[in-house]
């Protein structure tokens, strides 16, 4: 099965969305060296380890019920840009410490024809606004990112930490901070990427 077809079958993409993912892949390949975005640049890696990996978040959270999302340390736009493609009404804020990556993402926004995306050149712990949902992918240790991001999440809001197979140790080491900052772990979602390309663990927390 071709990788675009894999996305279409799994996530019920329409032709316009499929075209947006194709543009995303091509633009990422074109600009990657200039902006030093990702080492995973092959067709299989981009579609499976970036696009697919981002979209499986829709299986743990109904983004139709979410108004605004903050993606911390988005890098090349993952996971928020793939989610924005299939949920065009989402309001996205990117908090990114690399100005170079923000410049790439601003261009990508135009290429994909996306709207309602804001960019903040700042570290997460310095940002002061709050959101319905905060997303973090491969940014650092769980206890640290929980502390950095807690104030960004509204009351009864959600926090998603995208982790790998070693999540259990990080989760164990984070119990004290989870209790201290008044968050509950409400879901652990394990997913296998296509073609045995890896295991993803997505942790869903809610504030109280």
Curated annotation (Swiss-Prot):
UniProt enzyme class: transferase
Gene Ontology CC entries for this record: cytosol
Predominant subcellular localization, coarse grouping: cytoplasm
Entry's Gene Ontology molecular function annotations: rRNA (guanine-N7-)-methyltransferase activity
Residues given in the record as S-adenosyl-L-methionine binding sites: 73, 78, 96-98, 124-125, 137
Record carries keyword Secreted: no
Transmembrane segments: none
InterPro entries: rRNA_ssu_MeTfrase_G, SAM-dependent_MTases_sf
One of the Pfam families matching this protein, by short name: GidB
Localization: Cytoplasm
Keywords: Cytoplasm, Methyltransferase, rRNA processing, S-adenosyl-L-methionine, Transferase
Enzyme Commission no: 2.1.1.-
Function in brief: Specifically methylates the N7 position of a guanine in 16S rRNA.
Family: Belongs to the methyltransferase superfamily. RNA methyltransferase RsmG family.
HAMAP family, sorted: 16SrRNA_methyltr_G
PANTHER family the record matches: S-ADENOSYL-L-METHIONINE-DEPENDENT METHYLTRANSFERASES SUPERFAMILY PROTEIN
Name used for this protein in its record: Ribosomal RNA small subunit methyltransferase G
Organism encoding this protein: Phytoplasma australiense
């Amino acid at each position: 099965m071709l990788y675009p077809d894999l996305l279409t079958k799994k996530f019920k993409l329409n032709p316009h969305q499929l075209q947006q993912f194709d543009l995303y892949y091509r633009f990422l390949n074109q600009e990657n060296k200039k902006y030093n975005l990702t080492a995973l640049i092959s067709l299989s890696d981009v579609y499976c380890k970036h696009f697919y990996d981002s979209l499986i978040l829709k299986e743990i959270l109904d983004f139709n019920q979410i108004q605004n999302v903050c993606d911390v340390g988005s890098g090349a736009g993952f996971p928020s840009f793939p989610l924005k493609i299939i949920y065009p009404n989402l309001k996205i804020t990117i908090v990114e410490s690399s100005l170079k990556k923000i410049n790439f993402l601003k261009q990508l926004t135009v290429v994909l024809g996306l709207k309602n995306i804001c960019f903040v050149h700042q570290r997460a712990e310095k940002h002061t606004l709050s959101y319905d949902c905060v997303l973090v992918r491969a940014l650092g240790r769980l206890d640290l990112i929980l502390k950095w991001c807690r104030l960004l999440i509204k009351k009864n809001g959600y926090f998603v930490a995208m982790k790998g197979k070693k999540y259990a140790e990080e989760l164990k080491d984070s119990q004290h901070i989870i209790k201290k900052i008044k968050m509950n772990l409400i879901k652990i979602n394990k997913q296998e990427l296509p073609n045995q390309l890896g295991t993803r663990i997505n942790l869903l927390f809610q504030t109280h």
